Swiss-Prot record:
Carrier of the growing fatty acid chain in fatty acid biosynthesis. This is Acyl carrier protein. The gene is acpP. The modification O-(pantetheine 4'-phosphoryl)serine is found at residue 36. The keyword Cytoplasm applies. It comes from Wolinella succinogenes (strain ATCC 29543 / DSM 1740 / CCUG 13145 / JCM 31913 / LMG 7466 / NCTC 11488 / FDC 602W) (Vibrio succinogenes). 4'-phosphopantetheine is transferred from CoA to a specific serine of apo-ACP by AcpS. This modification is essential for activity because fatty acids are bound in thioester linkage to the sulfhydryl of the prosthetic group. One of its GO terms (biological process) is lipid A biosynthetic process.
Amino acid sequence: MAIFDDIKEVVVEQLNVNPEEVKEESKFVEDLGADSLDVVELVMALEEKFNIEIPDEEAEKIATVGDVVRYIETNK
């Protein structure tokens, strides 16, 4: 679960939410209150944290914290 913990840290910092709110099933927009700009900034922060590039077409498919976990596990 180390990847989840790292992602959670970035999400808490970028979206200014309580750590308890960030669960694998949490949706960035509906549950965590992100807008489209927040999502773009979050993707950029995740790319930097994990030293990966998330193409726009893939970023558009990422709606939940779990989606990010699976993407990073698959593409790291």
